[in-house]
């Protein structure tokens, strides 16, 4: 609740390892007016590429300080995930921990800033907030990666309908979401914050030498980003006589698959996986 003249806001996020949503959240936190807001950040773990970029004014609430969960719990999690029962794993192993951590806390607004587990955790602590928002960053109709965290599509829809507003980063994400869920909740589009000043400053930190015309792409190496299509495009350019480099900055679960695809298409000299870079702007 409001403390003095300050509004209390809680952000719920799985982690700050990497990814566009995580970077967006950190940028937002670094642009708050902390004379007007008290901000808490609920995280599973306090680690990741962006964890140290959270401003000191933000109070972190960490669910699990030990990232090495007991062997039995890990085995149960894998088994339940395999059989599509991961929500019940969260319900059994995590729900009470979250409720206990947040006991006595009161907020003007609670925001689950990512789809999936963040929304599930948010649904456990509705009594702690007056207003509830949830962010959707992707096309869930075509890439419904979150369904494993819920009992069913109906359950996931119900969690979204517990919110006062569902926020989307684009009209396309909003339209595809409504194709999937058709929620009655208020929906809004808020485009991603771009911290232009920081981008310009960091772009001048050092100079990168390019040997030829270069196309640089930045993003997580996951199916939704469709970097496999970029590799096929690179093959078309090379086949048509263009001497061109493609740099792909980012890490993710598809790194080995994309690396094999690059090798199989004989593009090792043209397409380069550069991994995660703390400064991708240079």
Where are these regions (language model features)?
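Conserved nucleotide-sugar phosphate-binding/catalytic loop shared by glycosyltransferases and other
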Residues: 6, 13-16, 31, 35, ...
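Glycosyltransferase donor-sugar binding loop
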Residues: 41-48, 194, 218-222, 245-258, ...
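An aromatic- and histidine-rich active-site surface loop
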Residues: 91-99, 109-130
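Membrane-proximal helix-turn-helix segments that form the acceptor-binding/catalytic region
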Residues: 97-106, 149-167
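A short, histidine- and acid-enriched strand-loop-helix "catalytic/donor-clamping" loop
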Residues: 116-120, 131-149, 165
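Carbohydrate-associated surface elements
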Residues: 172, 193
């Amino acid at each position: 609740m409001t403390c003095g003249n300050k509004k209390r806001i809680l952000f719920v996020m799985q982690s700050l390892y990497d990814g566009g949503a995580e970077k967006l959240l950190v940028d937002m936190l670094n642009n708050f007016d902390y004379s007007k807001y008290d901000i808490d950040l609920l995280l599973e773990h306090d680690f990741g590429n962006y964890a140290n970029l959270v401003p000191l004014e933000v109070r972190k609430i960490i669910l699990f300080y030990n990232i090495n969960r007991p062997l039995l719990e890990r085995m149960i999690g894998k088994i339940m995930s395999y059989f599509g029962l991961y929500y019940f794993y969260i319900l059994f192993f995590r729900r009470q921990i979250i409720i206990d951590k947040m006991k006595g806390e009161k907020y003007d607004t609670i925001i689950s800033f990512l789809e999936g587990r963040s929304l599930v955790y948010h649904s456990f602590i509705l009594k702690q907030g007056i207003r509830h928002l949830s962010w959707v960053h992707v096309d869930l109709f075509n890439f419904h990666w979150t369904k494993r965290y819920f009992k069913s599509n109906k359950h996931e829809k119900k969690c979204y309908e517990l919110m006062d507003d569902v926020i989307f980063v684009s009209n396309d994400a909003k339209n595809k979401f409504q194709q999937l869920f058709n929620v009655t909740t208020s929906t809004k589009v808020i485009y991603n914050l771009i911290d232009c000043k920081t981008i310009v400053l960091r772009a001048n930190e050092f100079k990168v030498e390019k040997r030829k015309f270069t196309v640089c792409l930045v993003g997580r190496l996951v199916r939704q980003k469709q970097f496999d299509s970029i590799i096929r495009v690179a093959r078309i350019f090379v086949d048509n006589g263009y001497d061109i480099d493609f740099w792909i900055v980012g890490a993710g679960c598809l790194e080995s698959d994309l690396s094999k695809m690059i090798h199989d298409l004989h593009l090792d000299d043209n397409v380069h996986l550069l991994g995660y870079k703390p400064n991708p702007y240079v």
